[in-house]
Amino acid sequence: MTRPNRSTIPACEPSSLKPDLGEIELISAPEKIFDASKFTSFLNICYSNTSDLKSFRDAIVVELRRIRKAGMIEIDNSFTKNPLSAEQVIRSYTWLTDSIIKSVWHICKIWLHPVPNPTQAEKLSIIAVGGYGRKEMAPYSDVDLLFLTPYKTTPWAESVIESILYILWDLKLKIGHSSRSISDCLRLGKEDYTIRTALLEQRFVDGDHATAKELEMRLWKDLFKLTAKDFISAKLEERDLRHEKQGGQRYMVEPNVKEGKGGLRDLQSLFWIAKYLHHVKEQSELVDLGMLRKEEFVKFQKAENFLWAVRCHLHILTNRASDQLSFDLQVETAERMGYQDSKGRRAVEVFMQDYFTHATRVGDITRIFLTALEAQHVKEMPLLQRIFRRIPQIKDPYTVLQNRLSVKSFDAFLEDKLNLLRLFEEALRTGLLIHPDAMRAVSANISLFDHDMRQNKEAQRIFMDLLIKHGNPERALRRMNELGALAAFIPEFQPIVAMMQFNMYHSYTVDEHTIQCISHLAQIEREELIEELPIASSILKSGANKRILYTSLLLHDIGKGQNEDHSVLGARIARKVAPRLGLNKKEVETVEWLIRYHLLMSDMAQKRDIADPRTVRDFAKAVQTVNRLDLLTVLTVCDIRGVGPNTWNNWKAVLIRALYRQTKKVLENGYEALTRDCLLYTSPSPRDRVQ
């Protein structure tokens, strides 16, 4: 592999290797990340001192590997000092990658494959796509490249592309690449939404600028134009499938920072759609277009910066592209981000509460934004479906707007602050989703959930009806929680919002666990679990007090996160809160008792031998009445099932049922009936316990 005569090859200039910074701020001085002047000098000297191109190429790989490692260390060190400066970090990794790719391109173009007078067909443009195209790179993000030619790829272009890729692979970069003509891009983009999304984010890196400009013009003229409805539909469907794959919950305690619900991909989907519709280039244009309000955009930026910071720290900690915030990484990530123990809570718990708070904000923003777009731009439902669809009867001051519940006049609506509560009940009654404008009205007027409202008898009635009247209270509670209305109406609920439980047992945050428990109670009440939960189902069917049950579940973990037994503290809090929800004195006492002892039945059944008469006797003495036993049994079942998808199993069911039946027999017939011989239950064998 001989080299051309040195006199025929121009020297490389530093300016040709420097990416355009524009207004981008890096986390460190650009020359500390990649010094183009020093590398240019190295190239010119190295070329003069090597006898053949292979030696020249090998020396370049060694030097670029050293430079990249030093640049990564510089970014990491600066990030350690400023652990929340995520925007500067992801731009810095992009700058480093751009510098390397521009350098490799010029090496190949000038020295490895020089063409003194290239023809029109021998033009090549290097395009960044995907996250790299957005200038958003974590330490170990993929580098997605499009090698673009005006027409069919020529032998020269093939040689250049091959040389570029082999050098980048030798540098251990994870490259995703394609070589296409402009017509190829248009054809494949029409067929594949993933390719179309990548092309939406294309960015010129180096090479022939005219070819890149031609692609951009043709994309907007021939591909993106007049296809917004299809694109939005595809992105919304893609989002739903992604959420389902990641567990379907925003509050999974080991979340995926990139793909999970409330993660970075949700924010990116929002911007993709805005860009597709309005050709926006900067996020700030979302406010100018009226797609987000200023305060929503501030939340957007803060959440995005936080999530990117978490993702970058994860990559650094694991030395790979890791996006799953698993238990073993949460402590180290919290430490890297500067969190400390506070008010009896571990640093990791404070960190994760912040994480879920930001994830909730992402949900608020994307829901409002995407729901509005879905209503405006997605294809209408088929004619027959529209004709035969049941239109619910709507009460004043509400209306149906784009098949969602909204209000006729927001000024009139806000004259009565109880309407903020009535909105959620009306949504349950009609089965309609709440329109984004109505959700914005709730968020913007949270201050109306004041002391007077909490003491208002009508407000108490509305909230209790939410819980017990419509059969699916979890829908309203989850939406209230996400909008901040639940904690505004019950301030004692605020500390457990987005609260992480740092153990392997719980799958959800405390607030989401609470709502899951209420969802299970509603399923039992709707008689959907008769075969699986015969005792709990019969208790509900026989007329158990639903006001007590739903209130107890809503408040059962409200004492968590403090330096005190959460059952004891929760019972004291419930004594104050339950009357505000409209419960009478006797009901309040029962709720207080249930919360104080909401772990008792589970502990007795799973930690003691229920074939021992003393276990049943002790439990019966604590419970005292069949009514309490019934209520505690239902509460226990819902609490266990609400922990996670697989926490309820046949072994636990057998234990709970046996303890219930034996205790009920004692409470009805007296302690003299309690002998080991009359107990029909025997402890499970070791094999049964494993099963």
Q: Which positions does each model-derived feature cover?
A:
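Non-catalytic interface/linker regions that flank or bridge core catalytic/transmembrane domains
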Residues: 2-128, 135-137, 141-506, 575
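Structural motif corresponding to the C-terminal cap of alpha-helices
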Residues: 108, 112, 431, 525-529, ...
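Acidic/histidine metal-binding catalytic segments
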Residues: 111-122, 178, 435-438, 479, ...
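Single conserved hydrophobic/aromatic residue that forms the stacking wall/gate
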Residues: 681-691
